[in-house]
Amino acid sequence: NIHHASRENNTFRTALWTGRHVQLTVMSLQPGEDIGLERHPHTDQFLRIEQGVGVVQMGEDKSNLNFQHYVGPGTAILVPAGTWHNLINTGSTPMKLYTIYGPPNHPHGTVHQTKADAEKEHN
């Protein structure tokens, strides 16, 4: 049950399943925390908010995020490959979400307890 797995997750990111062409991860963003401005050159991404509120930003250039939209439970976000994007928790409770990458974006079994852990691995 992805809804339950998302809401029960307390890690910044955990890869629950990794196939040859897609990957499912769950994430938890603390109040004021963001995913971090990023771009996946060859990976499409689908995100669904299960709990919490925030803002999604997207654009073709990281200095021009010309799309901004408020998000909440039930919001689905589609990020085309090559698009700069960020998701920010603007609420007072943790934001819980799941994301599907195609193709996979993280090694099988990835667990990042915190955003800092994710950034260490990425750099």
Predicted regions and their residues:
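Conserved short histidine dyad/triad with adjacent acidic residue
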Residues: T25-P41
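Short beta-strand His + acidic residue motifs that chelate non-heme Fe in jelly-roll/DSBH
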Residues: G36-L37, V56-Q57, V79, H85-G91
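Short acidic-glycine-tyrosine-enriched beta hairpin
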Residues: D61-P80
